[in-house]
Design a protein with these regions (language model features):
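Non-catalytic, solvent-exposed segments at the cell envelope interface
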Residues: 2-384
Length: 384
């Protein structure tokens, strides 16, 4: 599958200069393309990497922040990641976002967004693939709860289960993971002194008035309200995603400036919002060898078809669509072609024509007569 211009985005403009027509998304159903998570990770990598590498007096603070976000899991790496980093080979990172919402969760529960990021310094390209949160999967190690949603993997077994599930689902190695608590975005913006934004449209929301094209300095609260409005946007949820991306890009632009790198409040706030198995030395390597990969960014998503199974909505991706995504990621990783993964233990139940709700039952039934139990909301297991 080729990623021509309509299927990817390249971010080369300043965030406060983005035009609305440049960010009109392609049609798709219930699929969120949130590139914001990479930018938060990029801030961390650059802030901690440069902060410790260039300015010795801030080394201890940077190291402390990096150590506080370091949360290795039990996954056995499919590849020698130290060797890959040393030689500057392409690597993959599973990016997950937890939205605390009004429940006060912190790195708990299901993931609001999951993306696979590939950094290829040789091609100077970063590839981002969004995965539907409601994608029909069998959670690795919890297959007895099939049918399951992809965003349940983290709730069942933390980052380890999420990584294993994505690896199995797409047949693509995941080298690292990063989990971001989006509930702390307001504090991050305040820590860098606010961000400058040119609103993409005029609207009033939560007591704030936004004027299209008028450069506005926003604190964390105002920026969040600018991001959250959806009903007044003619693009609906896509418009909200565009505004979220705009704010995060502005935060990234501000975060990598020297004043932010020397700001202990910024580093401390950042360290509270992310968990990753990237060590401090890994981050320094990324900063030194992989920043060039951000020169061009390509993004796409796994397309599914919405189906009701056991009274729950799922995004069921065809095997063809899954294979296209597997091909994109493996090519970006300089890996040979391989068949995409199976949804359930080698049984191909991925075609939209093969899964349907029973109508009179709480169970899910396939065209072959196999029946699975009703979708169950997983209980968080308390693991990163």
């Amino acid at each position: 599958m080729s990623l021509h211009r309509s299927q990817h985005e390249e971010f080369e403009n300043r965030p406060d200069e983005l035009e609305r027509e440049e960010m009109i998304p392609r049609p798709r159903r219930k699929s969120r393309k949130k590139t914001i998570f990479f930018w938060i990770l990029l801030i961390l990598v650059i802030a901690l990497g440069i902060g410790g590498h260039v300015l010795h007096e801030h080394y201890l603070n940077a190291r402390k922040a990096a150590d506080s976000v370091y949360a290795p899991n039990s996954v056995k790496k499919q590849r020698d990641v130290d060797r890959l980093l040393k030689k500057g080979k392409p690597i993959s990172i599973l990016l997950m976002g937890t939205d605390t919402g009004a429940l006060g969760r912190s790195f708990k529960g299901r993931t609001d967004t999951m993306m696979v990021c590939v950094l290829n310094p040789k091609d100077k390209t970063m590839t981002l693939v969004s995965l539907p949160r409601d994608a029909l999967v069998a959670i690795n190690g919890y297959e007895q709860y099939y049918p399951s949603k992809l965003n349940s993997a983290y709730a069942y077994g933390g980052s380890a289960t999420a990584v294993k599930t994505v690896q199995k689902y797409l047949n693509v190695p995941i080298d690292f993971y990063a989990t971001i608590n989006m509930g702390g975005l307001e504090g991050l913006i305040n820590a860098v002194g606010g961000v400058d934004i040119k609103p993409l449209l005029s609207f009033s929301f939560a007591g704030y008035n936004f004027v299209k094209g008028k450069k506005t300095h926003m604190d964390g609260t105002e920026a969040l309200q600018y991001c959250r409005m959806r009903d007044q946007d003619p693009l609906g949820d896509y418009g909200r995603q565009n505004r979220q991306r705009q704010v995060i890009m502005a935060l990234a632009f501000k975060g990598v400036q020297l004043t932010s790198l020397l700001n202990d409040d910024f580093l401390n706030s950042l360290s509270k919002q992310l968990r990753t198995d990237l060590s401090f030395n890994n981050m320094v390597s990324l900063n030194m060898k992989y920043r060039v990969a951000t020169h061009h960014m390509k993004s796409t998503h796994l397309q599914g078809t919405t189906q009701v199974i056991g009274e729950a909505d799922f995004e069921v991706a065809s095997r063809k669509n899954k294979q296209e995504i597997t091909d994109v990621l493996r090519k970006a990783l300089d890996l040979p072609h391989a068949e995409t993964g199976d949804t359930l233990k080698g049984t191909d139940l991925e075609s939209p024509n093969q899964l349907e709700g029973t109508g009179n039952s709480n169970d899910a039934t396939t065209s072959t007569g196999q029946t699975y139990q009703t979708y169950q909301t997983p209980q968080y297991q308390g693991q990163y």
